[in-house]
Amino acid sequence: MNRVEPIFKITKSMQHLLNVEITNKNREQVIGMLQQKIEEREQILQDLTQPYSIEEEALGIEVVKLNQQIEMKMNVIFDQIKVELKLMKKKKKFNNSYTNPYQHVQSSDGYFMDNKK
């Protein structure tokens, strides 16, 4: 049996997982499953040793190509998360300005300091 075959299958399943439409509701599940598959693949990669057969090298090249596609899709997800975090921070700042509109004003108006003794 080809030693690279399990790595190829896991990588292919990762690609399939990322091809499914990722929404806000299922994003956390997809990321969790991806992490699990990455850990599985890493365990298999650690046990993999040289020399490689011609078949294994060809399959390895396919895995590298798939991995580049997976990485691009994961970067898109990461960018979406960053945009959402920025929007959440803006909303939080905007909502706080309504609850305490004078929070940013640091003045001592209305205080009387008596210097006499």
From Swiss-Prot:
Its main location: cytoplasm. Keywords: Bacterial flagellum biogenesis, Chaperone, Cytoplasm. One of its GO terms (biological process) is bacterial-type flagellum organization. One of its GO terms (cellular component) is cytosol. It is found in: Cytoplasm, Cytosol. Belongs to the bacillales FliT family. May act as an export chaperone for the filament capping protein FliD. Homodimer. This is Flagellar protein FliT. It comes from Oceanobacillus iheyensis (strain DSM 14371 / CIP 107618 / JCM 11309 / KCTC 3954 / HTE831). The lineage of its organism: Bacteria, Bacillati, Bacillota, Bacilli, Bacillales.
